[in-house]
């Protein structure tokens, strides 16, 4: 019985809790239904969110209580299973264990349902808020558009034509009356007031914005003798009339006619303006063609402005030279050809003259400038008689292009001038030798530059710059008719040679013309330039030159080689004992060689030093004297110079003759071949066939004739 009673008691007790739980579940459902029913009424997402949070909080609290109760019942059940005795209350609680478990499961399921519902509500709230935001933006945009339209209409109402059209209407029905137009004018003064400096701009337009807002809202507030609602209806009537949707011309057709009449005028102006670009293009093409014709990549106007003075100066000098050539006596010799007179076409046609000068300048850019720079600077140079010994040119190297052959100049008219003697610019110039040199001597047929266009502006006339040409004995018949190629200041371009050649061709015309003033037998100056200047200033103090004029020109039809050859003096002693060597300086005959080699018995036993200039190799191989060991120099050899007969040039003896120690006057060549024999560490003397000398002192030299 007690057990039954307890069981029944427990059963009765267990049957008791479900109603509270059921009541709690119904309350929760009612609470959930209440917000659901209140959702459409409230319409605010914040209230819905707050209610959902409260419902979820109540459910969580019920779940915690049921879990605690279930935990106690589990403990009681375990104690009963162990055989312990429980009191009546504990036994009643154990009897309600199944009810508590069912309520707990129901609460959990309800919590899950409310959680899902809360999420759906949150999504709905977000969507609603977004929709409301869009609707609000659309409403604001619509309001702003209405405000802009209202301002436009109020501005256009100030036009009399618009006011008349609105009074008359488009189809005869008036849109606005005069009273309504007056109301709109008064309202325009409120929404667009004149600037009142007593108020701030923000305050002044704040009042205007209130009037606009009330008009858009259509409030019943009085304004301008009426209300905002009435004004809003008037404005909406104007908008619905669509009067301002189309453009209206109020010039009664005059504006359209003027536009139609002005259109052909504009077209005519465009048609007249079209040929102008064509003319400009034609002018540009002419300028470009001028650039190609001149071959100087300059326009003709630029060229004429830049080169006019120089061309005029060349023309004047050309005329002077031609006149001086024509005035010379031309009956000196029967073999003298008649000079070609320069036709003065260049004066009558400046364009042809300038083109001819350009063509010649283009052909003579390279070697022409070099020869002019090296050959025409005669004013500041000193005359060195040891250098003035002309070598003949090869007369076969003539230019095929037409040249002006100058007549043979009378010796009396030419030799009377003291500045007509060609001078070697520097002793350090590279000497050149002719391939057909035999025994040459100076003769006096003098030649002037032939081509006038190749002259450069100088301080003195070009006819004063002359060169003495040595003639060969077997060329006496053509001695007076040599072409102008022998002039050092005239450039002759061979047709078979390129204008700009990197190598040096000794047979070319410019270098053949250089042979008239370069001497192969000239002593090479020392490598030290201060010594050269010192020596030069020392001997120039006692140097004098004189010129003798002859009444008639002496023709040298045949010159014998035996009359001109002299025996080179010997060299004896040391530096303290100078010896004078008389005689002319003559090139030994060489045949069939471009650069002949002659024996040089006065060199020392050592080979030629390397690395030095060609003209200074003889100096590098000077003797080392027994006294002071000086190597090379000018202070041992003192020659006296005698001039060739009938040369028109005489020279007094040196009062302080020059000394050239350890140096040979004649027979020195710069382009000798090196010897093949070996003698000691340095080998045989390079370029000389003799055996090496055992001694390095000052040897005793014997007289030897150079052939």
Swiss-Prot record:
Entry function: mRNA-binding protein that acts as a regulator of mRNAs transport, translation and/or stability, and which is involved in neurogenesis, synaptic plasticity in neurons and cell proliferation and migration in multiple cell types. Plays an essential role in cytoplasmic stress granule formation. Acts as an mRNA regulator by mediating formation of some phase-separated membraneless compartment: undergoes liquid-liquid phase separation upon binding to target mRNAs, leading to assemble mRNAs into cytoplasmic ribonucleoprotein granules that concentrate mRNAs with associated regulatory factors.
Modified residues (Phosphoserine): 10, 113, 333, 341
Region (Disordered): 1-48, 325-347, 412-496, 526-558, 570-707
Modified residues annotated as N-acetylproline in this record: 2
InterPro entries (alphabetical): Caprin, Caprin-1_C, Caprin-1_dimer
Quaternary structure note: May form homomultimers. Interacts with G3BP1; interaction is direct and promotes stress granule formation. Interacts with G3BP2; interaction is direct and promotes stress granule formation. Interacts with PQBP1. Interacts with DDX3X. Interacts (when phosphorylated by EPHA4) with FMR1; interaction with FMR1 promotes formation of a membraneless compartment.
Any GO MF annotation of the entry: molecular function activator activity
Free-text description of this protein's post-translational modifications in UniProt: Tyrosine phosphorylation by EPHA4 promotes interaction with FMR1 and liquid-liquid phase separation (LLPS) for the formation of a membraneless compartment that concentrates mRNAs with associated regulatory factors.
Record bears the keyword Signal: no
Location of Asymmetric dimethylarginine modifications: 696
Regulation of catalytic or functional activity: Ability to mediate liquid-liquid phase separation is regulated by ATP: moderate concentrations of ATP enhance phase separation, whereas high concentrations of ATP lead to inhibition of phase separation.
Compositional bias annotation for Low complexity: 1-15, 22-43, 325-335, 475-489, 674-684, 695-707
Coiled-coil portions: 58-92, 123-151
Name listed for the protein in its UniProt record: Caprin-1
UniProt note: domains: The C-terminal disordered region undergoes liquid-liquid phase separation (LLPS) for the formation of a membraneless compartment that concentrates mRNAs with associated regulatory factors. CAPRIN1 molecules in the condensed phase are neutral. mRNA-binding promotes phase separation. Moderate concentrations of ATP enhance phase separation by reducing the electrostatic potential of CAPRIN1, thereby promoting intermolecular interactions.
Composition bias type Polar residues, residue spans: 431-452, 465-474, 533-552, 572-603, 640-655
Residues that bear Omega-N-methylarginine: 163, 624, 631, 638, 696
């Amino acid at each position: 019985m007690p057990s039954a009673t307890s069981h029944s008691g427990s059963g009765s007790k267990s049957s008791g809790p479900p109603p509270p739980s059921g009541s709690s579940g119904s309350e929760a459902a009612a609470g959930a239904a209440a917000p659901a029913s209140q959702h459409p009424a409230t319409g605010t997402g914040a209230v819905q969110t707050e209610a959902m949070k409260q419902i979820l909080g109540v459910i969580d609290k019920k779940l915690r209580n049921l879990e605690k109760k279930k935990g106690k019942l589990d403990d009681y059940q375990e104690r009963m299973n162990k055989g312990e005795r429980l009191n009546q209350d504990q036994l009643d609680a154990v009897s309600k264990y199944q009810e508590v478990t069912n309520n707990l499961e129901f609460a959990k399921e309800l919590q899950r349902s409310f959680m899902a519902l809360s999420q759906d509500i949150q999504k709905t709230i977000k969507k609603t808020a977004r929709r409301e935001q869009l609707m609000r933006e659309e409403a604001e945009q619509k309001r702003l558009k209405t405000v802009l339209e209202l301002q436009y209409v109020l501005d256009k109402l100030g036009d009399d034509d618009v006011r008349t059209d609105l009074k008359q209407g488009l189809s005869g029905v008036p849109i606005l009356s005069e009273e309504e137009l007056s109301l709109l004018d008064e309202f325009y003064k409120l929404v667009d007031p004149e600037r009142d400096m007593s108020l701030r701009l923000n305050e002044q337009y704040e009042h205007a914005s209130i009037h606009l807002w009330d008009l858009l809202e259509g409030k019943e507030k009085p304004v301008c003798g009426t209300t905002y609602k009435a004004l809003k209806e008037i404005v909406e009537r104007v908008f619905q009339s669509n009067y301002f949707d189309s453009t209206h011309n109020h010039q009664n057709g005059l504006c359209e006619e003027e536009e139609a009449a002005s259109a052909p005028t504009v077209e005519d102006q465009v048609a007249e303006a079209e040929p102008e670009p064509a003319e400009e293009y034609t002018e540009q093409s002419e300028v470009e063609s001028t650039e190609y014709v001149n071959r100087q990549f300059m326009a003709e106007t630029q060229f004429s402005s830049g080169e006019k003075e120089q061309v005029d100066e060349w023309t004047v000098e050309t005329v002077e030279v031609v006149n001086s050539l024509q005035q010379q006596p031309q009956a000196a010799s029967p073999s003298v050809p008649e000079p070609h007179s320069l036709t003065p076409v260049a004066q009558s046609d400046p364009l042809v003259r300038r083109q001819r000068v350009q063509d010649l300048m283009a052909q003579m850019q390279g070697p022409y400038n070099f020869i002019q720079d090296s050959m025409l600077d005669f004013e500041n140079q000193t005359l060195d008689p040891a250098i003035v010994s002309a070598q003949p040119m090869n007369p076969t190297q003539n230019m095929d292009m037409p040249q002006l052959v100058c007549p043979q100049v009378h010796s009396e008219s030419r030799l009377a001038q003291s500045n007509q003697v060609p001078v070697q610019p520097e002793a350090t110039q590279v000497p050149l030798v002719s391939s057909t040199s035999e025994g040459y001597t100076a003769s006096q047929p003098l030649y002037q530059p032939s081509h006038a266009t190749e002259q450069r502006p100088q301080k003195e006339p070009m006819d004063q710059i002359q060169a003495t040409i040595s003639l060969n004995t077997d060329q006496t018949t053509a001695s007076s008719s040599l072409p102008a190629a022998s002039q050092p200041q005239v450039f002759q371009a061979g047709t078979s040679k390129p204008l700009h050649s990197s190598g040096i061709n000794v047979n070319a015309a410019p270098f053949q013309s250089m042979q008239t003033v370069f001497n192969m037998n000239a002593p090479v100056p020392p490598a030290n330039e201060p010594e050269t200047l010192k020596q030069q200033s020392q001997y120039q103090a006692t140097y004098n030159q004189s010129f003798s004029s002859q009444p008639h020109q002496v023709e040298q039809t045949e010159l014998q080689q035996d009359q001109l050859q002299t025996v080179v003096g010997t060299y004896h002693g040391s530096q303290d004992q100078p010896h004078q060597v008389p005689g002319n300086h003559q090139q030994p005959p060489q045949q069939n060689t471009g650069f002949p080699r002659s024996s040089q018995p006065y060199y020392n036993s050592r080979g030629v030093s390397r690395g030095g200039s060609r003209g200074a190799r003889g100096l590098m191989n000077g003797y080392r004297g027994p006294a002071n060991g000086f190597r090379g120099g000018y202070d041992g050899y003192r020659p006296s110079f005698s001039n060739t007969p009938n040369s028109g040039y005489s020279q007094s003896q040196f009062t302080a003759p020059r000394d050239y120690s350890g140096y040979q006057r004649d027979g020195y060549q710069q382009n000798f071949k090196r010897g093949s024999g070996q003698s000691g560490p340095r080998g045989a003397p390079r370029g000389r066939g003799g055996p090496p000398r055992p001694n390095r002192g000052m040897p005793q030299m014997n007289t030897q004739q150079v052939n």
